[in-house]
Structure formats: C-alpha cells, structure tokens
C-alpha cells in the first residue's frame, strides 16, 4: 500500500513511518523539514506545510493518509480540505486521550486534575473528533491513545477499546508510541473502525 504520513518527524509520526516500512508499505513522509537525500525505494520525503498548494497532488494516488499533527497547530478545516483535494478517501488521525470517557458521561479532559499544560491540545482534539463525526465523504478513523503516551517497546500486546479510557489491572492507563503504531497500521490493513473512534492501551 501507499501511505502518506503528515507530521512524519514527530514522536508518533516517526514510529508510524517505521512500522509502515517494516510491513513493506511505500511511505510518503510529509513534514515541514524533510531531507529528500534520505529517500529510498520505499520512502519518499516531502517538505511541505499542510497549506502548501502543491501537496494535494503529491498525495494523490495514496491508499491512506495519516495525520500526526498537534490539534493546536492545524485547523480541522485545513486538514480536511487537504485530504479531499488529494482524492484519498481513507483518512486516519492520531488522536488524544482527553476526548475519551473516564467514567460514563465524564470526559478525561473535564477531570479537575487534568494537566493544565495539555488542556488546549485536548480540547482541540475533542473539537476535531466532533467535526469528524459529521464527515460522511471520507473513510476516517480517529485513534486515541491511553492517558500516558510515551516511547517504549514494540510488544504487539495491547487491548482495543471504543470511547472509554483503557486502564490496566495495575491502575495505569498507558501505551507506547511503538505499539500505538502497530494498532494504527493494523487498522489500515484490516479496517474495523470506519468513521469511528477507537482507543488502544495495555
């Protein structure tokens, strides 16, 4: 498959690139700073902002686009316009945990002890998800990580959920970037959450 990854230089984006290449896919890695000298037969780097008028043409013909960009750094309208202009129907979003339910009817982001430093990003992520839920012309998927989202090991062992924060038997809610990337690529290869949000955790 041909997969384009927006925000390919970030913590999550880099793991998504690595996982896609590991599975033999052809990857277009899009970032504001990209080195075409690092291109290979499987990997093409594109230096572009999401508003770059030349970007839609470079994404045309891909099987899927993954957006791994902070919600406070890009407007949903701009991202959706880019995907639509590219003609690619499969659109996957690296989401946040804030929009998950901690308990029925209570979102993680609304908890009194939610870290203030992440508040704007979490609220923007919830808004983005709300916008996506009204989109019916793209085959979108929004994948939320667990509360703690960090570098770790690629184990291949994790749980999948829907709209509720996953918490382990040890009381912790977390997932590594590496295992998150596995869940995202699994969804691309075998779609099970079209026009849905799902979550991943241990």
Which stretches of residues belong to each language-model region?
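A generic structural motif
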Residues: 23-27, 137-139
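Glycine-/Pro-rich loop/turn segments that contact NAD(P) or position catalytic residues
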Residues: 71-158
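Short beta-strand/turn micro-motifs composed of small residues
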Residues: 7, 31, 95, 144, ...
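Short, polar loop motifs at secondary-structure junctions
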Residues: 29-36, 147
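NAD(P)H-binding glycine-rich loop region in Rossmannoid oxidoreductase-like domains
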Residues: 35-86, 192
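Conserved hydrophobic beta-strands of the Rossmann-like cofactor-binding core
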Residues: 3-5, 65, 91
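C-terminal substrate-binding/catalytic lobe of Rossmann-fold NAD(P)-dependent oxidoreductases
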Residues: 119, 126, 134-202
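N-terminal Rossmann NAD(P)H-binding glycine-rich loop of SDR-like oxidoreductase domains
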Residues: 3-22
């Amino acid at each position: 498959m041909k997969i384009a990854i927006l925000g390919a230089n970030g913590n999550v984006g880099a793991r998504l690139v690595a996982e896609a290449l590991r599975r033999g896919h052809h990857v277009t890695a899009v970032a504001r700073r990209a080195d075409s000298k690092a291109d290979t037969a499987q990997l093409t780097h594109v230096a572009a902002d999401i508003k770059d008028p030349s970007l839609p043409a470079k994404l045309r013909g891909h099987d899927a686009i993954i957006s791994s960009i902070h919600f406070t750094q890009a407007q949903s309208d701009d991202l959706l316009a880019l995907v639509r202009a590219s003609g690619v129907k499969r659109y996957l979003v690296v989401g946040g945990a804030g929009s998950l339910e901690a308990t029925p009817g209570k979102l993680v982001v609304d908890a009194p002890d939610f870290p203030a430093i992440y508040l704007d990003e979490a609220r923007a992520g919830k808004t983005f998800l709300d916008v996506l839920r009204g989109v019916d012309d793209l085959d979108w998927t929004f994948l939320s990580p667990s509360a703690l989202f960090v570098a770790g090991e690629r184990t291949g062992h994790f749980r999948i959920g829907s709209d509720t924060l996953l918490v382990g038997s040890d009381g912790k809610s977390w997932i590594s970037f590496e295992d998150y990337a596995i869940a995202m690529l699994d969804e691309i290869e075998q779609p099970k959450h079209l026009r849905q949000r799902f979550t991943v955790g241990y």
